[in-house]
Amino acid sequence: MNTKYIFVTGGVVSSLGKGITAASLGRLLKNRGLKVSIQKFDPYINIDPGTMSPYQHGEVFVTDDGAETDLDLGHYERFIDESLSRNNNITTGKIYWSVISKERKGDYLGSTVQVIPHITNEIKSRVYKVAEGKNIDVVITEIGGTVGDIESLPFLEAIRQIKYDVGVENVCFIHVTLVPYLKKSGELKTKPTQHSVKELRSIGIQPDIIVCRSEKLISNDLKEKIGLFCNVERDSVIQNLDAENLYEVPLMLHREGLDNLVCKKLKLQCNETDNTEWIIMVDKIKKLSKNVNIALVGKYVELHDAYISVVEALSHGGYANDANVNIKWLNSEDITKDNIEEYLKDIDGILIPGGFGDRGIEGKILAAGWARKNKIPFFGICLGMQCALIEFARSVLKYEGAHSSEINPETKYPVIDLMPDQKDIDEKGGTMRLGKYPCKLLKNSISFKAYGEDVIYERHRHRYEFNNIYRDELIESGLVLSGTSPDSKLVEIIEIKEHPWFIGVQFHPELKSRPNRPHPLFRDFIKASLNSKHKFD
């Protein structure tokens, strides 16, 4: 079977949920026995989001092969339960970088390099590359931004051309749009959708399916109207209502017939959709009987997308323990010695996620100390582990002023220091320790009991590491180095001997958690937090 291509565009406004729509469709097609891959085209000129502020972009999602990518790739991985790669997130910056590099090498000798055909050909090659050598049945490509944006035009032109390059029977265009509800008149309005599709058609793309985001039910009459003005059949107008839980969306879209429409359009030879496992999972999520309160202590807490994979992984841990996870978002800048008890008195577990820089660092260190002293389950990720280590060195070893050399280059006790292979690197973008690395676990440690394996593989994104100069005295004072690189040179996991559940990890376990396969550390962190809750009840 030829590889089929599905392109998901968006209209009217951004943040409509194109990524969730693409991920949900991917799940439905996988449930039909098809091999699916999903990619995202981002129209910004940055090479990747690695140097962008979380306030601008949200979380940076890291793949196994070390690519810093859009947070939508996290949704894709969680929904289709497949590990993606750097080929699954392409930016305008990458496209132009590649074309200009080829021009400098003389690959276009004699030609005037232009948007068409050189940029569009490069874009098309990235679409095809996802499926190369992998026997992929369906490639779903989300086009970032909104139809009408200048930045998106080369991508839209490229996918218009692909339809004729590979054959119209091998391409399906899905347009996600907004049908707003006006409370004053009590009406849903279709005009924004009509204009969005008109804009798309003006550049040569006729959508095959229109997915309408709405907070109210869309009547058959309205679907008929949208179909008439947008040149699609009524049955090809799909409503996508707001859902209480993201993982309900595939089932909602299946009930609307989205996957059937796609299979019919692409003439896909596949099984009927078997959503049994997904239905069981969603039903379980709806019936969770326990509650657990987790403090997430960070500096971007007003923008939840900055920690989206952590939030999802906490929820997955809750699913495995029949528990709703209630997150208390705490800005680490607000935490002081005088008010920490007020902030954390009703908390069952404390999590400090990754991050960079000195803003709010002392509040994170205080939170780690509170968890250590009060035997509250603690989970520190990347910078969160480093904060726990700094607090331990200050309080237990009495190393006054102990710190990370990232935050205080003049500290007398740099218990966290720049990795040796990072010291001669000047550029910021894509130069950290990135991607999947092995980690050897200490037998009988909390981490080993969680994983049940001798060697694990986790994804990293950092420049600073545990300083081995202090290894012996930290171990003698009760710190357990439960995970290291295979050569034992890099400390990847720390625990505290006399604590029921205190773990810091240098990697990012949240990136590998799935709703149907919760990450073992998040699963056990929630379990320990539930036990802590009962203890203090």
Swiss-Prot record:
L-glutamine binds at residues 55, 355, 383-386, 406, 463. The active site is at residues 382, 508, 510. Residues 293-535 form the Glutamine amidotransferase type-1 domain. One of its GO terms (cellular component) is cytosol. Transmembrane segments: none annotated. It catalyses: UTP + L-glutamine + ATP + H2O = CTP + L-glutamate + ADP + phosphate + 2 H(+); L-glutamine + H2O = L-glutamate + NH4(+); UTP + NH4(+) + ATP = CTP + ADP + phosphate + 2 H(+). UTP binds at residues 14, 189-194, 225. Allosterically activated by GTP, when glutamine is the substrate; GTP has no effect on the reaction when ammonia is the substrate. The allosteric effector GTP functions by stabilizing the protein conformation that binds the tetrahedral intermediate(s) formed during glutamine hydrolysis. Inhibited by the product CTP, via allosteric rather than competitive inhibition. It comes from the Bacteria. CTPSs have evolved a hybrid strategy for distinguishing between UTP and CTP. The overlapping regions of the product feedback inhibitory and substrate sites recognize a common feature in both compounds, the triphosphate moiety. To differentiate isosteric substrate and product pyrimidine rings, an additional pocket far from the expected kinase/ligase catalytic site, specifically recognizes the cytosine and ribose portions of the product inhibitor. PANTHER family: CTP SYNTHASE, CTP SYNTHASE-RELATED. Belongs to the CTP synthase family. This is CTP synthase.
